[in-house]
Amino acid sequence: MLRVAFSTTDGVHVDEHFGRCLRFDIYDVSADGHRPVRTRVITTPDEPGDESGRLDARIDAVRDCAIVHLAAIGGGAAARVTNARIHPVKVPETTAIASLLERLRSVLAGTPPPWLRRHLDTPTTSPAGSPR
């Protein structure tokens, strides 16, 4: 089982920049299918000039995910996401979440690349403190 996040404004498409995203839809994906887990909404207001705090809130929202799909991400933010052991995947804006879920399910049903297999073998802690 793999937990993945999607930066979205409508719950249907990946259409948001990571640093501005206020909503992440979270799914569990396996070779057999996928299921929605929850929608996480960023509720803390962004303070002007506090890029670190803004990124911390978003990283915390997806901390239990192995992958976060997004429309855009800056270099510094990508490094911080990667350091949190989350793999950022940039996709064209308005890519359908359903197609990404099916593509990931298909990869998991075959022979996933080594970086993805490591995520399958390594449980992490969710924002609520429980394993993913």
Where are these regions (language model features)?
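Non-catalytic interface/targeting segments
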Residues: 1-60, 64-65, 89-132
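Mid-chain, well-packed structural core segment of small domains
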Residues: 59-91
